[in-house]
Amino acid sequence: MIQLLLPEHMQPQELRKERLELDPGLKIGIGPEKESPEKVEFVVIWNQPHGTLRPYRNLKAICVYGHGVDSALQDPELPKEVPIFRLADQTMALWMSEYLLTAVLMHRRQMVMHIREPENIPWGRTVRLEGNRVGILGLGFLGQDAAKLFLKLGFEVWGWSRSPKTLADVSCFHGNEGLDEVLSNSDFLISLLPLTSETENLLDLKCMKKMKKGAY
């Protein structure tokens, strides 16, 4: 009986090896199970075509191999009664936080100008942009990790989430009024919101107009 089914397009042999190190007795399959799909209990998916899970009628859990589950939830044939889990991988969180920090510092020190026109802009002549407040929309696993990194480097961090949250050294806001507060006071705005029906198109022109002049 195959207990765990891995996607064939995401380094399945490495995943299989790691899982077997944790549980040598685990029965693992790779790719679509055609002979006995009813015996599959757990699946790992990522950006799967709609209907991929149709044959697996006895699933106990679905794991999305990423931090967002929007690709799975968009499948109209996703079994509604089966719990869905997502990864909370510290390495992936660090990569995202470093990317965000790089983007903020590149803008703050006007590095793009130096890269595009190095011969016209003497090194050190650009003005350091003012503003030290980073607003983070979405205080989940990724948002919290990013907040910690910005705090370590002396940034002031404001965060917004749908429901109330408390994070050390972070000014936390929630709800519509809280969103307006973060939008209108952030020098740098970062969105780490999950893509759902409630967050899609949240940052529209109306929201952008609430941001302070010169915000990035």
Regions found by a protein language model. Give the residues of each.
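Rossmann-like adenosine-cofactor binding region
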Residues: P164-Y216
